[in-house]
Amino acid sequence: MRLIIKNSYEDCSKWTADYICNKIIEFKPTKEKPFVLGLPTGSTPLGVYKELIKKHKEGILSFKHVVTFNMDEYVGLEASHPQSYHYFMMDNFFNHIDIEPKNIHILDGMAKDKKKECEDYEKAIRSYGKIHLFLGGIGADGHIAFNEPYSSLTSRTREKTLTRDTIIMNSRFFEGNEDLVPKTALTVGIGTIMDAEEVLIMATGHAKAEAVHQAVEGGVSHVWTVSALQLHPKSIIICDDAATDELKVKTVKYFLDIEKGNIETNVSRK
């Protein structure tokens, strides 16, 4: 596992966007061999999406041969609902880049047969071989996507009941009304994420400090689903200073020292 520590959220966003940009460009994707990218929603990746849009508009990066799979979607919300993750992704990212609509994959929270929808999603991922890079964020309780505490670390895409904490946290997007927050969601599993060639997780702010501590210094446990990253051959957590508040001083020093040669991922393409 790599732990990248930056000064601020803005620095984390720029580093992450540069990293993704480099990966796509180095892959040299084509129609026959697209780059497959896993994506999250929420406030954490917004800065990354803005940076990637900027790179696209500057002619540095094209998404024409990029295929995306989103992590999750609320059950019961139409794609046109302002708080659906379909709407979020179109409004904050896809409408601003040159990605082919057919290459966008987001779970359908209105599917009549949710089990089949989840099984088909797994099949769609497998049809491309694998996800090359899965970007994600984590909750204060260490959940990735909607894999809440005590989720199986080998889980696949399925319907999950949201915890009380998650409903309270997400109510800020629903006029502060917890009753308006969907109680279940379709989500990729921890096993689905772990199958990716590479996993990159963003964690910023003091509220994520305990989750970062458990992910890096704690043992592997389904209580903190993010801890599964310890078993991944190529996982990265990028965080700001505030998110390291619960780490041991020697842990922070270790990662700062070992990453000195890797800390910058500047993109300079014309």
UniProtKB/Swiss-Prot annotation:
PANTHER family: GLUCOSAMINE-6-PHOSPHATE ISOMERASE (PTHR11280:SF5)
HAMAP family: GlcN6P_deamin (MF_01241)
Organism field: Treponema denticola (strain ATCC 35405 / DSM 14222 / CIP 103919 / JCM 8153 / KCTC 15104)
A Gene Ontology cellular-component term: cytoplasm
Gene: nagB
GO biological process: carbohydrate metabolic process; glucosamine catabolic process; N-acetylglucosamine catabolic process; N-acetylneuraminate catabolic process
InterPro entries, sorted: Glc/Gal-6P_isomerase, Glucosamine6P_isomerase, Glucosamine6P_isomerase_CS, NagB/RpiA_transferase-like
Pfam families: Glucosamine_iso (PF01182)
Protein name stated in the entry: Glucosamine-6-phosphate deaminase
